[in-house]
Every structure is written in structure tokens, then in C-alpha cells.
């Protein structure tokens, strides 16, 4: 448990440090390092610049997301974009509502989970074996998605929808909800516009 906590703390702080660099400055450093033959420094500066670019794109994606899902207003003060560590991409987060009734959108560009989720969605044997009353495959705006239901313990259900699109994974989570409500919310998300921006 101690090792897991330390690992996640390291990832968190590395992400924050990685996210605080300057795009134009890193590109200038990369050019200067390349011209002087310091290829390792040029490579590092370009990686930093790509991380900055992912954050800039993530902030533009937040502008595309709806300010309201059903009756839940966006809590834009908690909007967050962080650079992914270890691979290129960003995690984009927005939540809606109040603690009593909330929804969350997370978009992970270049998600490492895409391969597994696509295998689940596109292989009938695997998808069929893992399907039950709490898991099923649905379509949202033409994209296959995995819908998962968990008991909220109060006679209601929490839903989670995983939608792989382009090279990204969007997860919509809604507490105390119904299947029709979460699918209605998902249909308000501009997947095509987000996909064009993230590519």
C-alpha cells in the first residue's frame, strides 16, 4: 500500500511539474539545442513542448463541452487539464451538479485503455462473456460504448459510460441516474468536434 501511495504521489507531482512549462520557450530551447548538436536536450525540450501543446488543446476542448447536462450545471471552477506522464496526451476533467446529484466527464487523449476497451466492444466472444445486467454495449452518436451500472445502495444506480473515439477515451459518470438519463447526457457531448480538436 505504501508503494502504491508513493507511486501515485510521484505521478501527481511529476504531472504538475510537466504541466507548468512554456511551449514557445521549450520550442526555442529545442531549436538551440539541435543547432548546437545537443540532441538529447533537443529531444527533452520537444517532449516538454508537446506536453504543453496537449494542455492548450485540452483547455480548448473544455470550451466545447456543454455548460449543462440535463438539469446539472457545470462546475467550471473545478475544470482541470493535466499532461499525461509517460506518454503523450492529456486528461481533461469537468464535473456537473452537486454532491447529491453529480456527473463527471473525463477525456484521456492517447489513452492506454483504448486497446482493451475496443477489444471488449468489437469482439463478440469477449463482449458476450462480459455482458450481464450491469454491463452492456450501447451506441452513442455512432460510437460503440460500454455502459456499466453499479448499485448506489439507496435503491438507485450509478452509471459509467466509456466511449472510445478517435485516439481518446471519454468517460461519463453519473450518480443516482437511469440508463436513459446518462445516454441523453452523452448525446449532448459534441464528440465530432472534440475528436477533430484532439487528433
Segments (PLM) and residue ranges:
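Bacterial Sec-dependent N-terminal signal peptides
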Residues: 1-22
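A broad, structure-centric signal for solvent-exposed, well-ordered loop/edge residues
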Residues: 7-8, 13, 81, 147, ...
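N-terminal "mature-domain start" segment
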Residues: 24, 28-36, 40-91, 184-199
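Short hydrophobic/aromatic-rich motifs at helix boundaries and adjacent loops
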Residues: 1, 106-107, 157-158
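Short, solvent-exposed recognition patches
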Residues: 64-150
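Solvent-exposed, well-ordered amphipathic alpha-helical segments
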Residues: 2-4, 25, 94, 148
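A short, solvent-exposed beta-edge/loop patch
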Residues: 20-31, 35, 45-47, 133-199
Amino acid at each position: 500500500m505504501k508503494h502504491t501511495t508513493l507511486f501515485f504521489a510521484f505521478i501527481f507531482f511529476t504531472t504538475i511539474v510537466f504541466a507548468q512549462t512554456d511551449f514557445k520557450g521549450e520550442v526555442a530551447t529545442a531549436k538551440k539545442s539541435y543547432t548546437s548538436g545537443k540532441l538529447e536536450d533537443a529531444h527533452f525540450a520537444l517532449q516538454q513542448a508537446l506536453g504543453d501543446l496537449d494542455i492548450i488543446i485540452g483547455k480548448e476542448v473544455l470550451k466545447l463541452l456543454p455548460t449543462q447536462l440535463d438539469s446539472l450545471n457545470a462546475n467550471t471552477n473545478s475544470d482541470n487539464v493535466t499532461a499525461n506522464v509517460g506518454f503523450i496526451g492529456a486528461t481533461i476533467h469537468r464535473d456537473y451538479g452537486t454532491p447529491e446529484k453529480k456527473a463527471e466527464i473525463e477525456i484521456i487523449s492517447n489513452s492506454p485503455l483504448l486497446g482493451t476497451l475496443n477489444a471488449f466492444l468489437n469482439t463478440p466472444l469477449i463482449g458476450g462473456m462480459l455482458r450481464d445486467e450491469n454491463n452492456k454495449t450501447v451506441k452513442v452518436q455512432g460510437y460503440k460504448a460500454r455502459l456499466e451500472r453499479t448499485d448506489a445502495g439507496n435503491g438507485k444506480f450509478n452509471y459509467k459510460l466509456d466511449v472510445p473515439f478517435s485516439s481518446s477515451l471519454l468517460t461519463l459518470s453519473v450518480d443516482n441516474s437511469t440508463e436513459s438519463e446518462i445516454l441523453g447526457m452523452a448525446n449532448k457531448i459534441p464528440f465530432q468536434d472534440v475528436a477533430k480538436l484532439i487528433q
